[in-house]
């Protein structure tokens, strides 16, 4: 099979070609020498297809960078030249294997220390760190908290991709800890997030999602919720647009009668209304669905304003807002339900047919719940 050089450079699975046999064209099939219009002869080698065995070692090394870490051993065994070209990837592969076999905090610390002294590029840490994260629960429970911190701190030193490991630790590893340990690890992650530069991707939305892993209604929950609300003003527009809807949803952790909710709602609403229309859909929609936190006398006016803002949004943001608007109807006087649905009908026509059908179905489900 001929090797496509262009595909090797641009297609993720190109390395698979090297794992297959690469037969050379038969001699009898060699094309005749062509004579161009200029009268010169074309170099026969220029017309031959490039095969894996013709590739320079530098290109093989580049292909190897796209090989999934679990396949590095097989790819390195293709031939001697590949084995040497894959040296740096084989080092990562060995650390990845060891990460999959850790059984104690001591083995985690030893591995991380060796990686710090051996791996030249921060990106080489990604695959072993992700393996450590996935095997965190293989450690004795009393050592898992410190291991969590070591892995989290190591990920902090990896530009761009390290934050993805941190997000996974928060969303998938933190729930495995007991209640009394989650507060400590949450605070550790929060402190690390504060150290990131403003232009860097961060974990504020994930931290807000993790509030559900804390004891609802507790002083610890309230304190951390308020800290995230207070950070909104310092975040980029895109970060605020992601964080506000999550904070709206996490108001459920307070309980419906908590007298702090109206004030927190007002802060979220103020920030949402200051977002550009290109980022408002989810925040406006979620705030409309969360009017239950307000006194009864204020709900209709607040909902009406948010609905009007939603209907003025660009089509893409309108589609997002419509997913939540009808969920606020349960908190409105019944005589406003039909009128509210009537107002949304023209907005539905602005959506693409598939999205329109989905939005109508969602609204009908919300209406049916009102009269069950």
Predicted regions and their residues:
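Non-Sec secretion/translocation targeting segments of pathogen effectors
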Residues: 1-50, 88, 370
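Intrinsically disordered, low-complexity segments enriched in Ser/Pro/Gly/Ala and basic residues
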Residues: 20-21, 27-29, 37, 44-46, ...
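Skp1-binding F-box subdomain of Cullin-RING ligase substrate receptors
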Residues: 39, 46-123, 127
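Non-catalytic tandem-repeat scaffold regions and their flanking low-complexity/translocation tails
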Residues: 89, 94-372
């Amino acid at each position: 099979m001929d090797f496509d050089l262009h595909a090797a450079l641009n297609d993720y699975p190109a390395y698979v070609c090297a794992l297959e046999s690469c037969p050379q064209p038969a001699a009898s099939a060699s094309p005749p020498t062509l004579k161009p219009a200029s009268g010169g002869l074309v170099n026969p080698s220029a017309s031959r297809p490039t095969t894996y065995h013709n590739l320079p070692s530098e290109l093989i090394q580049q292909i190897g960078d796209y090989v999934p870490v679990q396949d590095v051993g097989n790819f390195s065994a293709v031939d001697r030249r590949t084995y040497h070209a894959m040296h740096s990837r084989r080092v990562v592969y060995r650390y990845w294997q060891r990460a999959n076999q850790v059984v104690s905090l001591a083995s985690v610390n030893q591995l991380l220390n060796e990686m710090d002294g051996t791996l030249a590029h921060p990106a080489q840490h990604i695959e072993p760190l992700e393996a450590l994260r996935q095997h965190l629960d293989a450690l004795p429970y009393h050592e898992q908290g410190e291991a969590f911190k070591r892995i989290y701190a190591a990920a902090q030193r990896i530009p761009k991709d390290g934050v993805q490991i941190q997000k996974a630790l928060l969303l998938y590893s933190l729930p495995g800890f007991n209640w009394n340990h989650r507060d400590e690890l949450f605070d550790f992650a929060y402190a690390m997030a504060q150290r990131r530069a403003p232009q860097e991707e961060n974990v504020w939305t994930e931290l807000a999602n993790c509030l559900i892993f804390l004891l609802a209604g507790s002083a610890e929950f309230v304190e951390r919720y308020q800290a995230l609300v207070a950070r909104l003003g310092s975040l980029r527009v895109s970060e605020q647009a992601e964080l506000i809807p999550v904070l709206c949803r996490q108001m459920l952790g307070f309980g419906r009668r908590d007298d702090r909710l109206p004030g927190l709602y007002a802060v979220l609403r103020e920030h949402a209304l200051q977002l550009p229309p290109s980022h408002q859909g989810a925040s406006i929609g979620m705030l409309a669905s969360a009017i239950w936190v307000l006194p009864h006398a204020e709900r209709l006016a607040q909902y009406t304003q948010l609905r009007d803002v939603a209907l003025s949004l660009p089509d893409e943001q309108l589609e997002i807002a419509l997913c939540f608007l009808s969920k606020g109807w349960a908190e409105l006087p019944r005589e406003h339900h039909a009128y509210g649905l009537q107002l949304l009908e023209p907005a539905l026509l602005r959506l693409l047919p598939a999205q329109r059908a989905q939005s109508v179905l969602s609204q009908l489900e919300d209406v049916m719940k009102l009269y069950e």
